[in-house]
A protein has these predicted regions:
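A short helix-loop-beta submotif of the ANL/AMP-binding
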Residues: 66, 79, 85-109, 126-129, ...
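AMP-dependent adenylate-forming
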Residues: 6-14, 31-54, 170-172, 181
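Conserved AMP-binding/adenylation subdomain of ANL enzymes
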Residues: 194-211, 218-277, 283, 308
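Adenylate-forming
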Residues: 85, 133-139, 256-301, 305-312
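ANL superfamily adenylate-forming
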Residues: 130-168, 194, 272-273
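Conserved pre-ATP/AMP-binding loop-to-beta segment of ANL
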Residues: 24, 156-177, 181-182, 205-211
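Conserved ATP-dependent adenylate/AMP-binding module captured primarily in the ANL superfamily
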Residues: 79, 94, 105, 111-141, ...
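Conserved AMP-binding/adenylate-forming core of the ANL superfamily
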Residues: 21, 25, 34, 42-73, ...
Length: 312
């Protein structure tokens, strides 16, 4: 029995053929962003709950950030870290750094997740050349042996995409299980990231016109790929969740149609719904739940609210 063939056939049936032809698997971040500029330019792309930018504006803002990198001497293969919560700015950097030919590493930004000593070990271990931070991390970043920039730093002039291939490293996924004196992470190429983002398209339900809240941090590989890049692939509107403690207020306000969560968060959200009522989850059609074991009871609880909870 050819399991691979059967699996491919099963997943391909989840998307209409004419839609699938419009969403080929791209090899690099650069190719994905070019498609977004051409096909989604006027659609809303990213929102911080107050300001919303279109895909055309996102493309231009990423290009200006690339020029900032070039102007500050970064070259192909340099590793650049970002220490900041989910925001419009950190999302721009997550895509600007690889399209400049550099390698991005998103660091966990939860309180006390990264100490000064751990950050120093990280910089030395990975030979990090630059660090973008939110202002609240100034103390941790002070005195580090690396160029430090504010998360808002950018240029007024756009810069071109670098000459990258699918085999060039794009992202280092920092492991949360690191010991402070021996940090490590997985190095993922442009091609690997794009394959994973494309694989995320194959779910039941409609492909386009989705709204999501990026709740999982970009330092979480599942959150960065399925929670952001797959949504970018389909021209979805992505709300940046800057503070996870606010999701109880953000969900009914933003009315997302799809969420990417870990089981603990899914359980919490469903528990809140039992208290606040079904209206709390109004609009949500799908929850993709991964990163850890998901109990069958969560699937049933979600189904009771008319939500398709997909484990994987």
């Amino acid at each position: 029995m050819n399991y691979q063939s059967e699996q491919t056939e099963y997943f391909e049936k989840l998307i209409e053929p004419e839609i699938l032809t419009k969403l080929p698997r791209y090899d690099t971040f650069c190719e994905l962003l070019e498609m977004c500029k051409n096909d989604y330019a006027d659609l809303p792309a990213i929102s911080d709950m107050v300001n919303t930018i279109t895909y055309g504006e996102l493309y231009d803002r990423i290009a200006c950030r690339r020029n900032f990198l070039y102007r500050n001497g970064f070259k192909k293969g340099d590793i650049i870290a970002v220490l900041a919560p989910n925001s419009m700015y950190s999302m721009e950097l997550y895509m600007a750094i690889p399209t400049a030919g550099c390698i991005v590493i998103m660091l966990p930004s939860a309180e006390n997740a990264i100490s000064r000593e751990c950050l120093t070990a990280l910089i030395n271990k990975f030979d990090i050349k630059g660090l973008f931070i939110n202002p609240e991390y100034k103390e941790v970043a002070e005195g580090q042996p690396v160029k430090v920039f504010d998360i808002h730093d950018t240029d007024n002039v756009p810069g071109p995409t670098a000459d990258v291939t699918k085999d060039d490293i794009a992202v280092i996924c920092f492991s949360v299980n690191n010991s402070p004196d021996n940090p490590y992470g997985a190095m993922l190429s442009h091609g690997a990231i794009m394959r994973a983002a494309h694989n995320g398209l194959f779910i039941p339900g409609h492909t386009y016109n989705q709204r999501t809240i990026a709740i999982l941090p970009l330092s979480h590989v599942f959150g960065a790929i399925r929670g952001l890049l797959t949504c970018i692939y389909t021209g979805a509107l992505v709300y940046a969740c800057e503070d996870m403690s606010n999701i109880v207020f953000d969900i009914p306000k933003m009315k997302p149609t799809i969420l990417t969560l870990v089981p603990g968060l899914a359980e919490m959200i469903l528990s809140v719904a039992r208290i606040k009522g079904k209206e709390f989850l109004e609009g949500i059609e799908t929850i993709i739940c991964g990163g850890a074991y998901c109990q069958p009871k969560l699937v049933k609880q979600a189904k009771d609210y008319g939500i398709n909870l997909l484990v994987g």
